[in-house]
Design a protein with these regions (language model features):
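Hydrophobic transmembrane alpha-helices and immediately adjacent juxtamembrane helices
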Residues: 1-263
Length: 263
């Protein structure tokens, strides 16, 4: 118990630094941009528009209100992709600071994932615009959507801790992970419905082994379908999230003392 108390004291001791790092990341993303934070809303809208044009001929007849279906999945996947790729580079990117002074190393991937979450909240504005523009039916379940955001935030933290640590020792991981993310996007029902896949084995693999499926499906249940996720999706999302966080933190803590030798 005293160990956890000590760790919480250290966390609160550096909470101001965490806030500054998150604030810096959010400001730097759109620095010197004419539209600034408007891009957080405009960018997902433009991507949604392009993907709707490209995929609508294949899937729109089978999926009601395709733009809303698309942007609800894209919003979550983009958060995971952006946050974990940023977290992966966080230790190496702050190598000079780590060499000069003591700072809890976990604070860097934590800051990257958190700043991506802030950006995701801006992106939710784009989703609401699409919902309003298409006159989509919404229910009060929409108000529960932050629950799924918390789930995928925890999951992304776990992945971010793991990736940031392994990237210190294996720099090629950045390139490998980019390929993995691309394949992962197509293996997640973002722009297609699982009902459109006739191969039951493929559907089983996606549902059983794709953790992002749980968060995309849960988010769509609340926002798009207007219902609460089933027990498998809801509780599975929590289990996967904390399992990923536990593995990520365990590996990060195990190897963090060796970072200084490689950065």
């Amino acid at each position: 118990m005293s160990i956890w108390k000590e760790r919480m004291q250290v966390f609160f001791q550096y909470k101001d630094l965490l806030f500054q790092l998150v604030q810096r990341d959010v400001k730097l993303k759109y620095r010197r941009s004419f539209l600034g934070y408007v891009w957080s809303v405009l960018n997902p809208l433009l991507i949604m528009l392009v993907m709707t044009v490209v995929f609508s001929t294949m899937f729109q007849r089978k999926i009601t209100n395709y733009p809303v279906y698309l942007i609800t999945g894209r919003t979550l996947f983009e958060f995971y992709s952006t946050s974990t790729k940023a977290a992966m580079r966080s230790i190496l990117g702050n190598g000079t600071l780590l060499k000069k002074t003591y700072v809890p190393k976990y604070i860097f991937p934590l800051a990257k994932v958190t700043s991506s979450l802030v950006d995701c909240f801006f992106s939710l504005g784009a989703m609401l615009i699409v919902i309003a523009f298409t006159h989509a039916k919404v229910s009060w379940y929409l108000l529960l959507s932050p629950i799924i955001l918390v789930q995928i935030y925890i999951f992304s933290l776990g992945a971010g801790f793991f990736l940031s640590a392994i990237n210190v020792f294996f720099r090629d991981m950045q390139h490998i992970y980019q390929a993995v993310i691309t394949a992962w996007m197509y293996a997640t029902p973002l722009f297609y419905d699982l009902d459109s896949i006739k191969n039951t084995t493929v559907v089983f693999i996606i549902k059983a082994f794709n953790p992002l499926y749980y968060y995309v499906a849960g988010f769509r249940d609340l926002v798009y379908y207007g219902r609460f996720p089933g027990p498998r999706i809801f509780w599975g999302g929590w289990i996967i999230a904390f399992l990923a966080l536990g593995i990520g933190l365990f590996y990060f803590k195990k190897v963090q003392d060796k970072f200084i030798l490689y950065i």
